[in-house]
Regions:
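Secretory targeting and sorting signals
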Residues: 1-27
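Short glycine-rich, low-complexity/disordered patches
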Residues: 24, 56-59, 177-178
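A short, solvent-exposed beta-edge/loop patch
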Residues: 26-33, 113-178
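A metal-dependent hydrolase signature that marks the N-terminal structural subdomain at the beginning
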Residues: 30-41, 62
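Amphipathic alpha-helical segments
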Residues: 38-53
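Exposed alpha-helical structural elements
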Residues: 45, 100-104, 159
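Short, solvent-exposed recognition patches
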Residues: 53-125
Length: 178
């Protein structure tokens, strides 16, 4: 599905919107933090996660339905790396904030509990649904997804989830104040 068409976590989690960032030693990060989703994962780190060199991340910001968001997408320089001819494997990181975000996150998770698997050790809580990872970090939701891949070959469901978790660990570490 296209990012701007999907409404995950009740118009929040994967709508392709908000970013929240923080720096070590800084005061707690407010719900609507400065822009910079592309700063949550470096180009080198994105390339490591995808297993292929990537270009600079492309950032988009916006807001809808009371949710503010920032999205960054890194694309493999070589097309076809995810198994789809002519398409670059992509890593997407989205950070969203808004007053109704926590309730929306919980609704999305509870909507189909058999399809949402909890993921331990990320943020305040995390789940993966439809091969998209969603992490609650304070009052923000970080979503990570790969795009333009084929599975089970060349990528298995476990490999996709691991790549998303690896990227989320990097991003969450940069979101949380120390």
């Amino acid at each position: 599905m296209r990012i701007w068409n999907r409404v995950a976590v009740a118009a929040a989690v994967a709508a392709g919107l908000a970013v929240v960032g923080g720096t070590a030693g800084a005061a707690p990060v407010p719900a609507a933090a400065p822009k910079g989703s592309c700063k949550l994962v470096t180009v080198r780190e994105a390339g490591t996660v995808l297993g292929s060199p990537v270009g600079a991340g492309k950032q988009k910001t916006g807001s809808a339905g009371g949710v503010t968001g920032d999205r960054c997408v890194w694309s493999a320089k070589k097309k076809g790396t995810g198994g789809l001819k002519g398409k670059p494997l992509e890593l997407e990181v989205v950070v969203e904030s808004g007053s109704a975000l926590a309730a929306s996150y919980q609704r999305e998770k509870a909507e189909d509990p058999l399809e949402a698997d909890d993921v331990a050790g990320l943020g305040d809580e995390a789940f993966i649904k439809d091969l998209k990872l969603h992490v609650m970090v304070g009052e923000r939701v970080l979503s990570v997804a790969l795009h333009n891949y084929r599975y089970p070959k060349p990528l298995t469901e476990q490999q996709i989830q691991q790549k998303e978790e690896d990227a989320a660990k990097l991003a969450v570490g940069r979101l949380k104040p120390s």
